[in-house]
Amino acid sequence: MIENKIEQNCALHTNKNLEFLCLDCKLIPCCTLCISRGGEHHRHGIDSLESIQTSSILSMMNSFKDVYPKVIERIENDQQILKDSDEIFNEIQSQYNKNKITLNQEFKKIHNILSILELDIERQLTTDFEINTLINTTITSSINNDIDNYNKNKNNNSITDILNISIKNIQQYNDDDYYKIDSNSIELIKQYQQSLLLLNNNNNIDNLNKLKEYNNQTIKFDNQIINDIRSNLKLIYSFENNNNNNNNNNNNNNNNNNNNNNNNNNNNNKKTEKLNIEIDENNFKFIKKQNKKYYIYSENNEFPKNEERIAFGEGCGSLLKVNWNKNLKNVMLLDGFEESLEPGILPDGIVHLEIFDIKTELAVGSIPSTVTSLTFNDGFNQSIEVGIIPSSVIYLDLHDIKQPLKIGSIPQSVQDLKLCNGFSQPLEPGIITNKIKTLSIHEIKTQLQIGSIPNSVTHMVFYDGFNQLLSAGIIPEGVSWLFFFNIKIPLVVGSIPQSIYYLVFSDGFNQTISPGIITNGVEILCLRDIKQPLEVNSIPKSVTNLLIDSGFQQPLTPGIIPNSIKELALGNIKTQLVEGSIPKKIQKIILDKNFNQSLEICDLDKSVEIRTNYLK
């Protein structure tokens, strides 16, 4: 029996009372709705609480005794989860507020840059307008002054009428008579003087010349550059996931984000050189790379003997049959290659090896220890474990490989590393070893960060298509030689470290070299066919040796080449030298055989040493 005064509402249906125990569900209490059609306990065996047996209620209580500690544990766990959730959310909220502050601060910087640029342009417009205003004021004042001087001597009668009357009166006198000068004559004499003064001054000529000094300018904006800037603004930020458990997802998301940005801004990605199969006069198949023939090997077909370059592809058969070829120096393993690569299969003596998307797993010893130059081409889809690349390799090229590198993947022997078009694997600190001396970077998709490039690197080249912002610290202070080709993101102050001694802006470089971009550590500067004009102070005073060559065609107006230059080398330049292009007291000028201009216009000091040499 149930006491009437006790509330017995169902937890699922609060307007109904608990009346039954479900015999099929561990004696869980139920109401009439629980057992009705659509209820969770419909057609289950039930026992009424009004007539429940002692054994059933005892069984339920014992079951509850077992369940209750789990409920307590569940509540405690939920409370801990709630606490953790609150802490995480509070941290997220705090970070959200910080992010908003950072966002506002960074965009304020951008707004300030744009405001300064706008003020500078407005200042130029104002200066030009003030000059035009001065010209207008000068002309107006001069002409009005002449008109005022002329008008103040006029009376109500016209000058012509007065002159006619005076001449008629004078003609009545004999030539020898004395003429009595009246007031009209005095007026005419004064007016005559004023007229002669007006005609004899040079104001008219000066004013005509001043008309030519007017400068009516129209401001124009380069929409292509504006669109590039708009697109590149998407590269100035990224989102980092701060959850410790999601680091891998974070890396993947960041890489995908960077890849998308790169794809959006580079629709003309350069691909690895396409390899087409050709047939020579002896009916031997070959492919050509960098104008060199690699004959395609197959054990079932005739093959030229003693070839220095061989390519092995899908279905080529065992490589053991080529071990006799002592001339073999260059090998390609093409897409689909699936033959054994156990140690010793590739013969010693190979010095250059290129590996594409092969199906055979590389093992330690697969690559001979004679290989000094190694390339992993687009599509290579294996993990490069420690020891796969032998310690004989000095030159390593990495294209669009599909597995991330590990610390130790690149051996300490590698001194020259090329990251080629499409390379997209993370470059966490330590991936590139501290033995690398020369690093060449093409149009890669992975984002460089501070620490990606070790301090051991002394020579760096950024090739066409590189499209990342080189913020301060990306290029480490150990680099002393730096080359730029047609990179896509403008350099900023700090992009070039103070350690750079030798700097080259090579063919196609299309960024503005504003003052401060080139650091004061640079002593040797080479300018080739760059696409943007230089400014005064673009070249810092630290530069003592300047080489201008290879079709350079930007104006060399006075002041562009600073007086600090001691030695100037001139090659095949397209721009015309003018007086002041070269500092008059420069110490030495070296002229290449392709230089075809006279230096007379530069009016150089007699002390300047001029000699002819071949530029390198």
Curated annotation (Swiss-Prot):
FNIP repeats lie at residues 337-379, 380-421, 423-464, 466-508, 509-550, 552-593. Residues 241-270 are annotated as: Disordered. Residues 241-269 have a biased composition (Low complexity). It comes from the Eukaryota. Residues 239-274 form a coiled coil. CDD domains: Bbox2 (cd19756). Disulfide bonds: none annotated. This is FNIP repeat-containing protein DDB_G0290639.
